[in-house]
Amino acid sequence: MPIRVPDELPAVNFLREENVFVMTTSRASGQEIRPLKVLILNLMPKKIETENQFLRLLSNSPLQVDIQLLRIDSRESRNTPAEHLNNFYCNFEDIQEQNFDGLIVTGAPLGLVEFNDVAYWPQIKQVLEWSKDHVTSTLFVCWAVQAALNILYGIPKQTRTDKLSGVYEHHILHPHALLTRGFDDSFLAPHSRYADFPAALIRDYTDLEILAETEEGDAYLFASKDKRIAFVTGHPEYDAQTLAQEYFRDVEAGLDPDVPYNYFPHNDPQNKPRASWRSHGNLLFTNWLNYYVYQITPYDLRHMNPTLD
């Protein structure tokens, strides 16, 4: 949250030079506050587990957030009870006339599926096009990043030969960027993907600013300069056991997966893994809610014209 200080305090300009968000008394006096409306397009099979992961991170902010869950796949789910979907999820037709402060598009286990073979690919394109006029800021996670880069920038699907699975080190490129505010210079985050995100590709074919990348030169966190779209290629929302569950699932399926990198103590799957990315995940989502949503969204959502003073 911003700090509130008198307009004339010398610290105002000093802190702003470091890109610290300072709210002057004159601006604060005219600021109205309401709950933020955040839409979550949940593409993961185990929807309840995914809900828990994202809501845990969103709840770590002092901001009040109203959550709406969205589904676009009408097929019967094998992993989530129909009663749960009917009670807690809406269809796109239910909300297409509404506006939202934020939208989160989750990952999906579709890394080896061509875009046009995804059953709900037309609906994904519809939601992304709709979000341009109805959402202040959208956050794409893992597979959704790949889908958005294709739809919004025409970047072809980039696929790794082997699945990237484990907990990897990253470093920030812009220490004073709002989305990385408070990040350590280097930090850990989990990945579980076939999608490939070379930083050079993002720089060459988009106007997006890369804010953090892996030690191997893959883009991890990047965003548009107007803060309307942000991308995270890993899974900072994952629980401590999620990578283990995926690993043992693949073992049982006879896929002979590699042991997730830097995850199990002593690289032994019989050891209980520890989460080393919780603080990063919480800070990332808090920064997104504050700087990319709350600070630029209009008070009256009927008039969508996000700006940042």
UniProtKB/Swiss-Prot annotation:
Pathways per UniProt: Amino-acid biosynthesis; L-methionine biosynthesis via de novo pathway; O-succinyl-L-homoserine from L-homoserine: step 1/1
Signal peptide from the UniProt entry: none
Single annotated GO MF: homoserine O-succinyltransferase activity
Residues that hold substrate according to the record: 163, 192, 249
GO biological process, one term: L-methionine biosynthetic process from homoserine via O-succinyl-L-homoserine and cystathionine
Name this protein carries in UniProt: Homoserine O-succinyltransferase
Database matches in CDD domains: GATase1_HTS
Entry's family note: Belongs to the MetA family.
GO cellular component, one term: cytoplasm
UniProt-annotated site: Important for acyl-CoA specificity, residues: 111
Cited function: Transfers a succinyl group from succinyl-CoA to L-homoserine, forming succinyl-L-homoserine.
Active site: 142, 235, 237
